Each structure stands twice: as structure tokens, then as C-alpha cells.
């Protein structure tokens, strides 16, 4: 497959015509024309509720919705019936945590999380562990804000029921050693749940080959629309477990027998998709996934690594002079796609506003990772630049030039 060009794909993104350097991709990516057009065409010509009727429109909509499961499965590995559509990564992680707690799989044990995790990973599993009568155990961080993966064997014990961690940190860009995590967890029979919100959009993944049991990610972080996320889970787990949420679409039959309600659940994934699902959004997500597969996730990952390295090289003078500090590793090869900095000269929000005046969009704040920022003495937050397929080297150069101007100009 020929290598893709960031310059060629930029025409798919009208917002870039405004001259904006968009470096807030870890929060949400821009939407290509083809995704918007696919959703518009479906909305105008084939929309109806799914799995609710035998009329033509419902059948067409149901097929498009089912096909979207197939497309997503091709992107992440596994089969279509291992793909559960949710509202976003946060809801997917809540669903995973509640499902395990509801079915007693966390009872009296521990769930291992890390102090670097996004709140959408940390909070659901802390609460689920409590619901199960157990506790969450926290893997500590090193001085850079990176989990102490070298302590995995000490923190995963016979009491560990699940390990729930971020695939790629949304602050440091550090990629978790999934193979090591799975190996340690399987020794004690613990389940591995991956928050891949920053993984699936940026790296080649095959969850089945990776050996994880569940994984979550969002459409809006990978060229798709808001309002749709994915919980991927092993088919045998989905078959075995009872869903914590019930309602329309989750059951094949409900009967009243002797004063009690008997429930026959649908097959996976439907028994975990309660209520009317995100139908139009599923069409958009499928189109986004197709676009990424056409480009090739290996190319996406390599492109982002090159931009990360180029950016940190350009920022080296500011770093060596002590004008900026990295949150996370200060070596490009140890972080992927995200460069987070702080400076004693400006607050994160002030720096973000000054960059915005120069046409550069970055993210400022605590990035839903308060504990990590507290740990690295950045309680006011940080400023991140995060890259995607439509960012080119010129974007990194504009960022570096703007930061130099802002941080070295005396007022």
C-alpha cells in the first residue's frame, strides 16, 4: 500500500480551509466530508428505527446498522457480534464495569487501575469495585507521570479480579505494555479491560490477538461523529454475562410466569444495546473506519510518531532553556501522538488563548487526569498538542514558532 500524504487528505476537512492549525485531536477529531455525506445520505434516504419492523426502510436501516458492526470489527479484530455500540468511551467503560459487578465477577476482590488513567477509566472501576464489596488498587507513577509497569507482578495478585487501564495516555502519550499486562493478569485469572480511546484511532490493533477481554473507544476521536462509542468484548463473555441494562432490543421474549417475570435475552451484541441505538452515528462511524483502513493504521501510527518527534525537536531550545517542561517522557520515542507541556511563564489557559490568537487550537487544563497532573506538580493543568492524519510538519513548525514568540518576547 503506498504511503498516504497528509496534504492529500486535508481536502476532506473543510474546517482547515479557515487556516486553523488543529492540534486538539486527542479531544476530538475533525470530520471528513465523506463521513458527513454518508450520514446525510442515510438520513435522507434510508432512515428508520432498526430491528423494530418489517417494512422496507426499517430493513434497510437495520442492514446498514448491522454492517457497521462488521466494519468496526474489521478495524479492531474479532467478529461483528463482539462489537457493542454505546454512546461514547465513557459509557462503554461504565457498561463493562457494571456488567462485571452485576454478574458478581468483582465480588470481594480488587480491580487494578493506574494513577495516570483518564477519569472515564478510573471512576467507573473504582465504583464498580466498591459495588462488588472490594476495592480498587492503584498502580503508582514514576516522576514523569508514567505508570510503574515494572511493579505489575507485585500489584496483580490472587485477589485481582480485573485490570482496567488506558491503552495510550491522553496526557503523556505513553503506550501501555498490553502484552505484559495480559500475561500478568492471566496468571491469576483476572480479566483485562482496555480504555482504547487513544489507541484505536492512532495504532493498529487486534484485540483478539492482544488477548484483552474487553476494550472501549469512541467514534468522535477517529473521524466519526459524536454520540457513538464501542465496547468490544469476547463473544464467550458476552454470551455468558447478563446485561446490567434492560429494555427494548435486549430481549427476545418476556413472560409472566407464576407472578414473576421471566426474561429471554437476545444474542450478543443486541442484549447489551438497550433502547434505540445511535443508528445514523453508526453509519458515520463505519465510514470513518473504512477511511482509516484505506489509509492503513500502520501509516497513521508512523505519521503521528514522525510529527511527535519533529515537534519535540523544534521545542528543544525552549526545553533546554527551562521555558517549557514536558508532562511525560522528554524523548519522542517514548510517547505517541501527544506532546504535553507546562511553563512557569503562563497558565495553561493563558497560553492556550495566546496560541488561539495565532490560529492554533490546542487543549488546556487537567484533561480528565487530575491525579497525574497533581503527581507531576502541574495542578493547574497542561497544554497538549495532539496530531492526526491531516496534520503536516508545517503545523508543528507553526506551533513551535508561536510558542517561541509567546515565551521569549518580553512585555
Swiss-Prot record:
Positions carrying N6-(pyridoxal phosphate)lysine: 221
Pfam families: Aminotran_5
InterPro entries on file: Aminotrans_V_dom, Aminotrans_V_PyrdxlP_BS, Cys_dSase_SufS, PyrdxlP-dep_Trfase, PyrdxlP-dep_Trfase_major, PyrdxlP-dep_Trfase_small
This protein's UniProt keywords: Pyridoxal phosphate, Transferase
GO biological process, alphabetically ordered: cysteine metabolic process
A Gene Ontology molecular function term of the record: cysteine desulfurase activity
Signal sequence bounds: none
Catalytic reaction(s) noted: (sulfur carrier)-H + L-cysteine = (sulfur carrier)-SH + L-alanine
Family, per entry: Belongs to the class-V pyridoxal-phosphate-dependent aminotransferase family. Csd subfamily.
Listed name of the protein: Probable cysteine desulfurase
Organism: Aeropyrum pernix (strain ATCC 700893 / DSM 11879 / JCM 9820 / NBRC 100138 / K1)
Amino acid at each position: 500500500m503506498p504511503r498516504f500524504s497528509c496534504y492529500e487528505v486535508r481536502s476532506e476537512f473543510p474546517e482547515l480551509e479557515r487556516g486553523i492549525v488543529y492540534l486538539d485531536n486527542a479531544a476530538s477529531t475533525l470530520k471528513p466530508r465523506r463521513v458527513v455525506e454518508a450520514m446525510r445520505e442515510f438520513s435522507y434516504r434510508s432512515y428508520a428505527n432498526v430491528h423494530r419492523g418489517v417494512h422496507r426502510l426499517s430493513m434497510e436501516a437495520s442492514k446498514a446498522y448491522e454492517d457497521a458492526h462488521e466494519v468496526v470489527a474489521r478495524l479492531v479484530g474479532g467478529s461483528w457480534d463482539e462489537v457493542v455500540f454505546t454512546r461514547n468511551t465513557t459509557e462503554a467503560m461504565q457498561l463493562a464495569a457494571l456488567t462485571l459487578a452485576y454478574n458478581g465477577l468483582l465480588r470481594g476482590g480488587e480491580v487494578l487501575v493506574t494513577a495516570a488513567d483518564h477519569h472515564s477509566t478510573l471512576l467507573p472501576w473504582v465504583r464498580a469495585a466498591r459495588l462488588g464489596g472490594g476495592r480498587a488498587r492503584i498502580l503508582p507513577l514514576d516522576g514523569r507521570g508514567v505508570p510503574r509497569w515494572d511493579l505489575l507482578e507485585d500489584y496483580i495478585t490472587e485477589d485481582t479480579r480485573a485490570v482496567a487501564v488506558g491503552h495510550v495516555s491522553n496526557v503523556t502519550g505513553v503506550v501501555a505494555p498490553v502484552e505484559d499486562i495480559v500475561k500478568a493478569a492471566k496468571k491469576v485469572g483476572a480479566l483485562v479491560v482496555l480504555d482504547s480511546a487513544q489507541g484505536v484511532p492512532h495504532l493498529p490493533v487486534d484485540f483478539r490477538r492482544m488477548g484483552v477481554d474487553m476494550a472501549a473507544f469512541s467514534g468522535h476521536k477517529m473521524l466519526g461523529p459524536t454520540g457513538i462509542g464501542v465496547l468490544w468484548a469476547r463473544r464467550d463473555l458476552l454470551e455468558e454475562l447478563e446485561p446490567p441494562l434492560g429494555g427494548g432490543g435486549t430481549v427476545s421474549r418476556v413472560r409472566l410466569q407464576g407472578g414473576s417475570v421471566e426474561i429471554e435475552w437476545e444474542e450478543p451484541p443486541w442484549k447489551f444495546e438497550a433502547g434505540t441505538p445511535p443508528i445514523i452515528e453508526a453509519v458515520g462511524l463505519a465510514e470513518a473506519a473504512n477511511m482509516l483502513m484505506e489509509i492503513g493504521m500502520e501509516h497513521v501510527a508512523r505519521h503521528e510518531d514522525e510529527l511527535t518527534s519533529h515537534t519535540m525537536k523544534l521545542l528543544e531550545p525552549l526545553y533546554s532553556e527551562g521555558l517549557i517542561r514536558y508532562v511525560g517522557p522528554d524523548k519522542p520515542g517514548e510517547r505517541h501522538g501527544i506532546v504535553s507541556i507546562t511553563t512557569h511563564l503562563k497558565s495553561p489557559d493563558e497560553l492556550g488563548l495566546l496560541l488561539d490568537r495565532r490560529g492554533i487550537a490546542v487543549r488546556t487544563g487537567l484533561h480528565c487526569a487530575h491525579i497525574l497532573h497533581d503527581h507531576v506538580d502541574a495542578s493547574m493543568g497542561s497544554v497538549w498538542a495532539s496530531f492526526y492524519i491531516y496534520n503536516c510538519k508545517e503545523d508543528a513548525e507553526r506551533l513551535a514558532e508561536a510558542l517561541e514568540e509567546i515565551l521569549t518576547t518580553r512585555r
